[in-house]
Amino acid sequence: MGTEFNGLFDEWAHTYDSFVQGEDIQYKEVFAHYEEILEDVVNKSFGNVLEFGVGTGNLTNKLLLAGRTVYGIEPSREMRAIAKEKLPEGFTITEGDFLKFDVPNTIDTIVSTYAFHHLTDEEKDRAIAKYSQLLNKGGKIVFADTIFVDQEAYDKTVETAKQRGFHQLANDLQTEYYTRIPIMQSIFEKNGFHVTFTRLNHFVWVMEATKQ
């Protein structure tokens, strides 16, 4: 993942919060139980938290309210600008992405919501290998994202979106890199993590991986 999605992020920045509130019918199911998904990620995190894809700051705010020390990473200038307006004065968001970032301190938990699918499976593998080097034993990765049980589940979801006339959603599912649970499980395990997957809506699962 380089900067190829930054234009999309900048365009989406000013309408993102309306998306997560379910105002776009095509993405209503993707963002179903959005607040509960964020809370679940917060509850599974601890200590110093590195957040990738801060976006407009929704998860960041909940992490801060829960007493976490948060280091935010966000590639989009527009997203960073909106997030800074919503977050406490003085909170710093650093430009970067899942693979290119600076770590200012010891990290206990790495979190992200609705973003890891911007990486190819090969890039996901490289990222998790990198995080494995950052985390001590007991450290965690907690990612919430659209992921599929298997190829059949993915194919059925794309077909259903097309049948419902949700062509933007179908195109999104076919353009980005939404992976399968067995692939992610293999990536986590080979990099020294024990991982569990919890489904929170039709699309989104929370991946909780603990460094062994």
UniProtKB/Swiss-Prot annotation:
Its EC number is 2.1.1.-. Pfam families: Methyltransf_25. Keywords: Methyltransferase, S-adenosyl-L-methionine, Transferase. InterPro entries: Methyltransf_25 (IPR041698), SAM-dependent_MTases_sf (IPR029063), Uncharacterised_MeTfrase_YrrT (IPR023553). One of its GO terms (biological process) is methylation. It comes from the Bacteria. This is Uncharacterized methyltransferase Bcer98_3087.
